């Protein structure tokens, strides 16, 4: 299942969050259509800006749009002219007041959408698809990612029949829900047709919401537990040994040694009463 489904939708509420955050009852379909139009407008004319994702939040009379980009200078423009133009287009599209936030992506080498876009740009420039894939994989692994997988599908190298090829380096656990797997997709337009580029980047495990809340509560109380488990872990192992049917001689051996351990306590009764108190 994890091999087929979109990693973002597969992990919603666990390691990823919604890209559109609003509630609507009767206007739900209109808002969904509006969100699609906003994202299409922002990504169609700004291929050079390196837009990673667009987040949308709505209130009753205002729309907040967050643009995550690797090159914020291109989106803002000279003295903010381009940003004002985008804000005017969004207000005309939505009919509401728009709050536009332009956020810089700190590490574009580990952003799956930007990596897919970079590979697609090289394919459009007639670079060999294998060279483009390996170059992007090397840059991502040097940037600190734990694993990456890149897949290209289409008429690779101008072949008559379309096919798909992928390269993988490191670990990419698609079935593990706690794994922080970023996913990106972009299409390269070539003279032979379109080539789809898919990128999966594994950045490490992320704790789920329940574990984070429990850890925060323990930190406030001042008794944060150790990660390895509590003191009752050896006892659990002993019970498991009994269930598996260990020999009775192994269980009776500690009981035979118990009186030897109690001998010093009998010789010094004053000390034993002090410890009991």
Swiss-Prot record:
Signal peptide: none annotated. Residues 216-277 are annotated as: Disordered. Residues 38-106 form the KH type-2 domain. Residues 216-226, 253-271 have a biased composition (Low complexity). Residues 233-243 have a biased composition (Basic and acidic residues). Pfam families: KH_2, Ribosomal_S3_C. Gene3D superfamilies: 3.30.300.20, Ribosomal protein S3, C-terminal domain. One of its GO terms (cellular component) is cytosolic small ribosomal subunit. SUPFAM superfamilies: Prokaryotic type KH domain (KH-domain type II), Ribosomal protein S3 C-terminal domain. GO terms for molecular function: mRNA binding; rRNA binding; structural constituent of ribosome. Keywords: Ribonucleoprotein, Ribosomal protein, RNA-binding, rRNA-binding. InterPro entries: KH_dom (IPR004087), KH_dom-like_a/b (IPR015946), KH_dom_type_2 (IPR004044), KH_sf_prok-type (IPR009019), Ribosomal_S3_C_sf (IPR036419), Ribosomal_uS3_bac-typ (IPR005704), Ribosomal_uS3_C (IPR001351), Ribosomal_uS3_CS (IPR018280). It comes from the Bacteria. One of its GO terms (biological process) is translation. Belongs to the universal ribosomal protein uS3 family. Binds the lower part of the 30S subunit head. Binds mRNA in the 70S ribosome, positioning it for translation. Part of the 30S ribosomal subunit. Forms a tight complex with proteins S10 and S14. PANTHER family: 30S/40S RIBOSOMAL PROTEIN S3, SMALL RIBOSOMAL SUBUNIT PROTEIN US3C. This is Small ribosomal subunit protein uS3. The gene is rpsC.
């Amino acid at each position: 299942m994890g091999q087929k489904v979109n990693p973002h939708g597969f992990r919603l509420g666990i390691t990823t969050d919604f890209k559109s955050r609003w509630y609507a009852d009767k206007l739900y379909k209109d808002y969904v259509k509006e969100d699609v139009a906003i994202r299409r407008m922002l990504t169609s004319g700004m291929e050079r800006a390196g837009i990673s994702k667009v987040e949308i939040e709505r209130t009753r009379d205002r729309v907040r749009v967050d643009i995550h980009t690797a090159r914020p200078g291109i989106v803002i423009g000279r003295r903010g002219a381009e940003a004002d133009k985008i804000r005017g287009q969004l207000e005309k599209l939505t009919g509401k007041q728009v709050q536009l936030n332009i956020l810089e992506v700190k590490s574009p080498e580990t952003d799956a959408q930007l990596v897919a876009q970079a590979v697609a740009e090289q394919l459009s420039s007639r670079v060999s698809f294998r060279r483009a894939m390996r170059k992007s994989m090397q840059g991502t692994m040097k940037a600190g990612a734990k694993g990456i997988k890149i897949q290209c599908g289409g008429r690779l190298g101008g072949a008559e029949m379309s096919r798909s090829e992928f390269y993988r380096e490191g670990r990419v656990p698609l079935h593990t829900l706690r794994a922080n797997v970023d996913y990106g997709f972009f299409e390269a337009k070539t003279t032979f047709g379109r080539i789809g580029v898919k990128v999966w980047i594994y950045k490490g495990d992320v704790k789920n919401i329940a574990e984070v809340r429990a850890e925060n509560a323990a930190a406030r109380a001042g008794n944060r537990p150790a990660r390895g488990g509590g003191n009752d872990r050896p006892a659990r192992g002993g019970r498991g040994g009994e269930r598996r049917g260990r020999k009775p001689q192994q269980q009776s051996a500690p009981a035979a040694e118990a009186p030897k351990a109690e001998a010093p306590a009998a010789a010094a009764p004053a000390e034993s009463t002090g410890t009991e108190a």
